[in-house]
């Protein structure tokens, strides 16, 4: 690969954080978390040694650990030094893996190390609903605290706790979870607890196991072997990427994070492994993201294909198609399995730092979001451009979707931001309908497929004509959020990316100018809109918007600015290179569900595009 014209530095992620600074109001800050997973579920691991979120056995199961949503009622699995005075913490992943290491440091020396993982291997269909935690002391003896308190059905189902020869087992009518350890632990009310003195340079495993009724010796779980298998699995997967370009460490960390979010039994991906982490502290914008969104399909395929995972991208599309076929309709959101249990309910938790309500399930499943139809057609087109085969099954599906868009595009909807107000004629949804016809026509022509191209082109032209007439406001010289509105919408950043209008067109430049003036904060972060959406309170800056902005800058050939913005947002990643959905532009704190697939898809999409543009410019200069 040619050398890029500028030294694009890799980001140095991890650094020490004072133990007492990790929590605010009794809750670890969202950014002070890592996560581990096994392609069925994932656990958040805070820098203070707490696993404070985790659903077992699957992403969409009830959370066994949920203290991130209620520090008193929620469950957790904690290991930390008993005396945290003047203790600092570092946290990092073993290179090119999702094996997480947390180190507690005092007076410049490591005093305690935790290595956390969930077993995974190339034999993906073999499930290990287990959390393995390796505890190591160093040159001095150390007192540690172990505190294990799982909860069931968000505290509604009270477990029986029984001592086993090799640990303890929590059992309800429907579920069970055990903890196996060689440390001396005891029952303390509704939890298992231990203050343990570790001798210098000693170590031991603690394992949480879901769905068991009998425990074996800790050594029988072969944690060292499982750790090696898991390490090999992640490194083998990472090494199969073809990407070796700029910001490699950030791109690969995003890819590894994304890979965890796939649910292996069906191949579908959750938008995030968490529920109800707030978009504003104390606010009500708290949603469950443990589902698959149709509109994410195209992003996933484009991103994975761009760094060499074409097989995974194609497989994801077919898995998504399989789910749609079984359901016999296109819905906004799908469960990752066949449960179809998306009903939204409120649980009696105080919420992260008092952010209520705490929602489980997602009501957006019932909305009409017309842009999703364009997303699935563009996903198939993206797969085709990456070398995938559009067979008769896929093409028949495309024609069915296009027939639906032919009449749906004129309807009001809730659009990309899933407004819970009355449906409107959102410009973004119209443009996505236009983009669907654009992709379908291109596939028909490029692949020699039978299609009513003339009819499609006529409808596509009609959509564009209407959007230019009703969706562009001459007074403000910009496209607007919906017909008849003066409001601006950051989703309009995608107009050039979708090919609806050139990036240097005066109409888009006017739109971009308004977005920069009215929605941009801190020079590179963006609010989604200023429209009253019927919800109380504000929200943070939506990180995916920054990556769309960078794509626009690349299309406008403003490469220096694109690079500056990209490096600025990369510096906003946490100590592990992870992102949430949003960020508080004032404090820098993460907001929303974490880690967020869309944010990481943005990293993966933009870095290769910027490098390619820089290489082309250099080649042109040198020719």
From Swiss-Prot:
> What does the record give as EC number?
3.2.1.28
What does altering residue 418 to Q do?
A: Less than 1% of wild-type activity
Per UniProt, activity regulation is: Inhibited by validamycin A.
* Biological source species: Thermoplasma volcanium (strain ATCC 51530 / DSM 4299 / JCM 9571 / NBRC 15438 / GSS1)
Name this polypeptide is given: Trehalase
Question: Keywords on this record?
Answer: Carbohydrate metabolism, Glycosidase, Hydrolase
Lineage of producing organism: Archaea, Methanobacteriati, Thermoplasmatota, Thermoplasmata, Thermoplasmatales
Q: How does activity depend on pH?
A: Optimum pH is 3.7. Active within a narrow range of acidic pH values (pH 3.3 to 4.0).
Function (record text): Catalyzes the hydrolysis of alpha,alpha-trehalose into two molecules of D-glucose.
User: Catalyzes what?
Assistant: alpha,alpha-trehalose + H2O = alpha-D-glucose + beta-D-glucose
Q: Which family does it belong to?
A: Belongs to the glycosyl hydrolase 15 family.
MF GO annotations: alpha,alpha-trehalase activity
Pathways involved: Glycan degradation; trehalose degradation; D-glucose from alpha,alpha-trehalose: step 1/1
Q: Name one GO biological process term.
A: trehalose catabolic process
């Amino acid at each position: 690969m040619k050398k890029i014209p500028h030294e694009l530095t890799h980001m140095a992620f991890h650094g020490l954080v004072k133990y007492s600074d990790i929590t605010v109001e009794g809750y670890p800050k969202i950014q002070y978390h890592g996560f581990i997973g096994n392609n069925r579920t994932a656990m958040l691991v805070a820098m203070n040694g707490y696993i404070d979120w985790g659903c077992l056995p699957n992403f969409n199961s009830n959370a066994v650990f949920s203290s991130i949503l209620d520090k008193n009622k929620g469950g957790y699995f904690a290991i930390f030094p008993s005396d945290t005075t003047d203790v600092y913490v570092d946290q990092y992943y073993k290179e090119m893996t999702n094996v997480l290491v947390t180190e507690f440091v005092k007076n410049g020396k490591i005093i305690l190390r935790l290595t956390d993982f969930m077993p995974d291997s190339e034999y993906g269909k073999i499930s290990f609903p287990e959390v393995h935690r390796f505890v190591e002391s160093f040159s001095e003896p150390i007192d540690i605290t172990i505190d294990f308190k799982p909860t069931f059905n968000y505290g509604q189902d009270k477990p029986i706790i029984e001592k086993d020869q090799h640990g303890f087992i929590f059992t309800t009518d429907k579920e069970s979870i055990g903890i196996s350890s060689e440390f001396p632990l005891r029952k303390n009310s509704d939890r298992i607890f231990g203050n343990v003195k570790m001798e210098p340079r000693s170590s031991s495993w603690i394992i949480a196991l879901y769905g068991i009724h009998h425990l074996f010796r800790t050594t029988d779980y072969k944690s060292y072997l499982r750790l090696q298998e898991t390490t090999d699995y992640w490194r083998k997967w990472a090494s199969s990427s073809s990407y070796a370009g700029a910001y490699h460490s950030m791109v690969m960390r995003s890819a590894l994070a994304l890979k965890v979010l796939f649910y292996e039994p069906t191949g579908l991906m959750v938008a995030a492994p968490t529920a109800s982490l707030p978009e504003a502290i104390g606010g009500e914008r708290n949603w469950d993201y443990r589902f698959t969104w149709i509109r994410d399909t195209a992003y996933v395929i484009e991103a994975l294909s761009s760094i060499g995972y074409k097989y995974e991208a194609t497989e994801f599309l077919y898995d998504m198609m399989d789910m749609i076929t079984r359901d016999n309709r296109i819905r906004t959101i799908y469960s990752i399995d066949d449960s179809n249990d998306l009903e939204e309910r409120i649980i009696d938790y105080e919420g992260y730092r008092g952010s209520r309500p705490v929602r489980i399930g997602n009501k957006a499943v019932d909305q009409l979001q017309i842009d999703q139809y364009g997303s699935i057609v563009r996903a198939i087109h993206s797969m085709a451009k990456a070398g995938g085969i559009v067979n008769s099954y896929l093409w028949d599906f495309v024609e069915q979707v296009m027939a639906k868009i032919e009449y749906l595009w004129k309807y009001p909807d809730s659009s990309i931001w899933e407004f819970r107000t009355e449906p409107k004629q959102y410009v973004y949804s119209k443009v996505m309908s236009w983009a669907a016809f654009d992709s379908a026509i291109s596939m028909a022509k490029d692949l020699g497929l039978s299609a009513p191209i003339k009819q499609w082109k006529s409808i596509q032209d009609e959509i564009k004509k209407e959007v230019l007439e009703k969706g562009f406001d001459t007074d403000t010289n910009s496209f607007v959020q919906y017909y008849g509105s003066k409001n601006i919408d950051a989703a309009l950043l995608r107009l050039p990316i979708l090919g609806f209008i050139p990036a240097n067109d005066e109409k888009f430049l006017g739109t971009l100018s308004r977005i920069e003036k009215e929605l941009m904060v801190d020079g590179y972060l963006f609010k989604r809109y200023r429209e009253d959406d019927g919800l109380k309170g504000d929200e943070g800056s939506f990180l995916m918007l920054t990556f769309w902005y960078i794509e626009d800058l690349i299309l406008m050939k403003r490469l220096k600015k694109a690079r500056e913005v990209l490096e600025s947002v990369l510096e906003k990643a946490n100590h592990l290179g992870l992102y949430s959905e949003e960020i508080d532009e004032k404090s820098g704190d993460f907001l929303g569900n974490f880690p967020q697939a869309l944010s990481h898809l943005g990293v993966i999409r933009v870095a290769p595009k910027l490098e390619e543009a820089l290489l082309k410019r250099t080649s042109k200069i040198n020719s």
